[in-house]
């Protein structure tokens, strides 16, 4: 047993921050900007509760109020394309009863007007997550989401004091896992990586899947449709885990199969 003062050269800590980062994403078309919005949120380490498409309804707003997300990602339209939807949704979000940080990453021709509509609410302007049809640009938005997480959410959950006690950086656990997968795949400095990979992170409440790959089809005659998949990707099964969400496994496989 050791008592008294202990000198540390470095201190490291690993913890899931009180349930993680709760987000909702809003886009225009489900298969395009709404999907791009979701990819940006998941890649930043967020738990995406729901993705909304087209114009928000009063029922949608009641759901958002009830869920009380930490961050809202507002997207919609390619640059120079549809602007009516994102402007309408900005107007709907202006009625929120609390000041939730809103990241605006849609049609650049409407972004500043969205910010004006939202008035004194906390907003952040980012590059469009889909500037051209089928073209993803999610890295700037992911960076902004991580910064909001560290500056606002971490402080709000009482972890700002912990940052003074540990060495290195503080980052969301899913984001750290994605970075680790990229290092394992691509290597670092003189160390070679192992190449394309799929990683599975089994948690108590969720199961995260990480993919580091170009995703190019093996058959040269394959025609690609939809948005381009990111090289480094995270997806999450929010209702399948080893402890808190173990009921999700039971529902997915059935009690008879699980008993075997």
Indicate where each model-derived feature is located:
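Nucleotide/phosphate-binding catalytic cleft detector across ATP-hydrolyzing
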Residues: 1-196
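Helical "lid/coupling" subdomains associated with nucleotide-phosphate turnover
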Residues: 85, 115, 160-199, 207-260
């Amino acid at each position: 047993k050791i008592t008294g003062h202990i000198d540390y050269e470095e201190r490291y800590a690993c913890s899931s921050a009180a349930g993680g980062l709760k987000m909702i994403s809003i886009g225009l078309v489900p298969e395009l900007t709404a999907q791009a919005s979701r990819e940006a949120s998941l890649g930043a380490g967020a738990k995406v509760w729901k993705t909304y498409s087209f114009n928000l309804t009063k029922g949608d707003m009641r759901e958002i109020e009830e869920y009380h997300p930490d961050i809202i990602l507002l997207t919609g339209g390619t640059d120079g394309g549809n602007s009516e939807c994102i402007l309408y949704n900005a107007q709907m979000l202006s009625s929120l009863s609390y000041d939730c940080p809103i990241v605006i990453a849609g049609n650049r021709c409407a972004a500043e007007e969205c910010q004006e509509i939202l008035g004194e609410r906390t907003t952040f302007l980012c590059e469009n997550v889909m500037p051209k049809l089928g073209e993803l640009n999610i890295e700037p938005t992911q960076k902004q989401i991580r910064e909001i997480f560290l500056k606002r959410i971490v402080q709000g959950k009482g972890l700002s004091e912990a940052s003074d006690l540990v060495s290195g950086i503080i980052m969301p656990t899913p984001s750290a896992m994605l970075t680790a997968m990229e290092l394992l795949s691509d290597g670092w400095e003189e160390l070679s990586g192992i190449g394309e990979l799929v990683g599975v992170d089994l948690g108590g409440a969720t199961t995260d899947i990480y993919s580091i790959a170009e995703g190019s089809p093996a058959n040269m005659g394959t025609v690609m449709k939809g948005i381009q998949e990111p090289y480094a990707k995270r997806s999450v099964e929010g209702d399948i885990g080893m402890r808190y969400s173990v009921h999700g496994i039971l529902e997915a496989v059935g009690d008879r199969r699980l008993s075997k």
